[in-house]
Each structure stands twice: as C-alpha cells, then as structure tokens.
C-alpha cells in the first residue's frame, strides 16, 4: 500500500516573466476630451506546453479593451508567463493545475502590468477584479463534456 503513495505531489514556481506586452490608444489625443464612461471588456486565455520532464510553461493572455461608444479608447494585452516544476499528478489533476492553479499564480502580475500600462497612457485608473480560474476551468470541462464525441471527429 505504501508503494502506491510513493509519488509525492511537487509544485514549484521556477520563474515568472512577461512574454509579450502591447498598449494602443488609437484615438488619442481626442479621446481624452470626451466624457470618460467606458465600456471595458476583459478577455482571458491560457496556454501551456511541456518544456522538459515535469517542467511546464504556462502563458496567461489578458486583453483589456476600453471603448467610448464606437471608438476604442485603449487596447492593452499582456502575456504573463511562468515556468513551473510539477510532478506527482496526472490527468485531470494536471489539467486543473495547468489550467487554473498556474494562471491563478500569474494573474496578479498581469493585472499589475495592465494597471501600469493604462496609467502610463494617462487614462483613469483601471482596477481588474480577481478572477476565479477554478470556476472558469470547471466551465471549460462542462463545455467539453457537453460537446463530447462529435468534436473528436474533427481531430
């Protein structure tokens, strides 16, 4: 019985870095003269890849678009990445770790980066709310289960 439990879970954050960054204010400077009542859209995406045995890169892409009516006030995109050493887990647990736990670790860094970029663009402060990556991952699993077998034919 003890031989089955020899594989101990190991999770270690090796590095956090900004992989890509972009800030655009296509309608500046006249956008600064308008009443600031923006519609803010937040898009999130994650990707992961295995770099070596038990070593993974996870990239969290955060895109924020602020619009005033039909005009884009600013578009900000950050790809915050991390290198993680993960062992002792497999299957759904590994997918959850790469798709929820790691992005949870990266989001505060991406949020800070976006806040700084928006501020340097001289726009009013933008405070992004925390994101529940566990809930997003569960929704993703439910969508995959609902779509089920028909999508496997496309592969």
Curated annotation (Swiss-Prot):
Localization, UniProt: Cytoplasm
Entries under SUPFAM superfamilies matching the protein: SecB-like
Cysteine pairings via disulfide bonds: none
Database matches in InterPro entries: SecB, SecB-like_sf
Biological process annotations from GO: protein folding; protein tetramerization; protein transport
Gene Ontology annotations for the cellular component aspect, listed alphabetically: cytoplasm
CDD domains linked to this entry: Translocase_SecB
GO molecular function, one term: unfolded protein binding
UniProt feature coiled coil, ranges: none
The organism's place on the tree of life at top rank: Bacteria
Record key words, sorted: Chaperone, Cytoplasm, Protein transport, Translocation, Transport
Sequence similarity: Belongs to the SecB family.
Subunit description: Homotetramer, a dimer of dimers. One homotetramer interacts with 1 SecA dimer.
Functional description taken from the UniProt entry: One of the proteins required for the normal export of preproteins out of the cell cytoplasm. It is a molecular chaperone that binds to a subset of precursor proteins, maintaining them in a translocation-competent state. It also specifically binds to its receptor SecA.
HAMAP family: SecB (MF_00821)
Descriptive protein name: Protein-export protein SecB
Protein's organism: Cronobacter sakazakii (strain ATCC BAA-894)
